[in-house]
């Protein structure tokens, strides 16, 4: 009886390990599909900032998508392990007993494979290499905006800076440098063609993104400060009372120093990802987000 219980525990542990290995892989694939950006810097950042305003449907989507696939994949792997000797036409009892004996090792192997996949997917090796590598790029090329002399010879004018979430040049057709046969952003393409367009090529190429500039708040920080948004694993939590990149100097601070009143507007919760902290601390922005619009009855539902 004791031996039977030991065998049962062995199988349970092995099955759980295999399932966890599958869940790690499917969760990574789900994350790539849902959020598109797959960098360790982004994960570290979002672990340290407020997640207020996150749609709870995201967690449900993960559960519905990742868990069933992991169960099916894990079941197939378990079935394959116990029947591999039959598939290979090696009807040997010793092979069958050996598989059962080392079943937990098979589960551990699944975990190892899933971790290797995670290392490759998030380029963890590249991240570690960048962390330990010394560079003098900032000493050589960074210009401190707080020391720059700014003149308003033609008078001061309002500045409107628009961010389009999840809009990229690939939506244009190949004529404009996009990736589609049909141009899905014809008006934006024409605006870029007829006006100043910052691009890395002769078409609507946009800028070359580097690590720490790809997700929403990272893009805003990099465009306002000229630096990527990167946090150390050892850095403190970025809550409402934490200084947000205290050494940086942004466009908002330049404007504030020259008498401008800054305002940031968005259709979501500005606390998400530390967005409101960034704008409040770097330019003393008035924050107007979905919550404030709702509170002041300014949404389209209130009209």
Q: Which residues are covered by each model-predicted region?
A:
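Transmembrane and membrane-interface helices of multi-pass
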Residues: 1-130
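Soluble catalytic regions of membrane-associated enzymes that act on cell-envelope
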Residues: 102, 121-303
């Amino acid at each position: 009886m004791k031996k039977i219980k030991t065998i049962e525990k062995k199988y349970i542990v092995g099955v759980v390990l295999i399932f966890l290995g599958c869940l790690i892989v499917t969760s990574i694939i789900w994350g790539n599909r849902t959020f598109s950006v797959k960098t360790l810097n982004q994960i570290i950042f979002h672990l340290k900032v407020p997640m207020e305003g996150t749609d709870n449907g995201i967690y449900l989507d993960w559960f519905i998508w990742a868990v069933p696939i992991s169960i099916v994949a894990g079941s197939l792997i378990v079935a394959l392990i116990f029947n591999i000797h039959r598939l290979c036409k090696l009807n040997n009892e010793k092979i069958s007993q050996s598989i059962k004996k080392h079943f937990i090792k098979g589960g551990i192997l699944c975990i190892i494979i899933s971790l290797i996949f995670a290392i490759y997917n998030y380029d963890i090796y590249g991240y570690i290499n960048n962390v330990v590598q010394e560079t003098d790029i900032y000493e050589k090329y960074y210009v401190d905006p707080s020391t720059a002399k700014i003149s308003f010879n033609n008078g001061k004018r309002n500045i409107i800076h628009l961010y389009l979430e999840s809009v990229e040049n690939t939506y244009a057709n190949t004529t404009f440098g996009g990736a589609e046969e049909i141009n899905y952003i014809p008006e934006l393409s024409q605006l870029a063609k007829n006006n100043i367009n910052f691009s890395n090529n002769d078409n609507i190429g946009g800028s070359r993104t580097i690590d720490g500039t790809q997700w929403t708040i990272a893009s805003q920080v990099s465009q306002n400060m000229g630096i990527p948004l990167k946090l150390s694993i050892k850095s403190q939590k970025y809550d409402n009372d934490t200084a947000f990149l205290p050494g940086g100097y942004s466009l908002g601070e330049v404007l504030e120093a020259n008498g401008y009143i800054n305002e940031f507007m968005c259709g979501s919760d500005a606390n998400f990802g530390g967005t409101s902290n960034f704008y409040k601390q770097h330019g003393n922005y008035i924050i107007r987000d979905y919550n404030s619009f709702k509170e002041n009855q300014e949404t389209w539902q209130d009209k």
